[in-house]
Amino acid sequence: MNIEEIAKKMVAKGKGILAADESTGTMEKRLKSVNVECNEKNRLQFRETLFSSASMKNCISGVILFDETLRQTASNGLSIPELIKKSGSIPGIKVDKGAKILSGSDKEKITEGLDGLRERMEEYYKLGARFAKWRAVYSISSKNPSEQCIKSNAHALARYAALVQEAKMVPIVEPEVLMDGDHTIDKCYDVTSRVIAECYEELAIHNVNLKGTVLKPNMILPGTNCKQKSSAEEIAKKTLECLKKNMPSEVPGVAFLSGGQSEIEATKNLNEINKINDTSFNFTFSYGRALQQSALKTWAKSMSEITKVQKVFDHRAKMNGASTEAKWNEKLEQSFAA
């Protein structure tokens, strides 16, 4: 498959991307929250449980991995990328080195990881990865994000995307405007518009083939501490409006990040977006916590009961798969408990 075919497959209707690329530090926090020791064995066991689930075939188009996981071997002797491929999904890799303080800014962040990326991409391709991910983060305050932050991160995302395509892989472009703060939904709309528009300007300058990319943006949401809450209908309307205004038509689709949304909110909001989608874009998900949280809690209580954990994960994956086609509803959600 060439990169355009892979990108289309990644955003296919009925499926979405499992973000299992948490760094060791992030996994430590997640496992600690459920009273499980964070060691290589436990990290692998939990992830392997998800990657072997039945829903991988019909609901998961791709899996984003952390460097450690890409190099691991499953209990059946297959490498993790081989296990994912056997499950009917595409293996991918997170390639950024995290967000650091942007010099000359008011504590804003710039993502690092461009040094040596060309060589790393060659190795990741040999290890079986066929797409990559790079995340840029922007926080909203009275002054931020600054022009410096927006431009610096867009430039880094574009350089990354060009290097990934050079290695015959699909870049996921992830500009995340964080939910933290008391900003309104309109403020989120304005900032996200500026951020996405700048990203596509830089991608054009760097001659990136947009048909071989996937956008992973935030939904348009009010800040976590905003007093004015928004309905799923309003979130969907503003999100669609923002993307129609700023996304070039060549991009095959969008895989939304879940940000700080709960599992149900992330599913419901995606469903609403697809209900009113009047574009040629496919709107799907690239969720981490919003796909894994319930499964993680179940696994922590009964690590040996793999089928039980997989059942919980399969339900979440099916619900999100349904929401990519606007087929999710409360009754379907409750069917799992029945």
Task: Give the label of every model feature segment.
Residues 90, 170, 212-214, 253:
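Proline-centered loop/turn at the N-terminus of a beta-strand
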Residues 117-203:
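Helix-rich catalytic cores of soluble enzyme domains
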Residues 39, 134, 173, 215, ...:
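Conserved, mostly hydrophobic/aromatic
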Residues 1-127, 140, 149, 228, ...:
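Alpha/beta catalytic barrel-like cores
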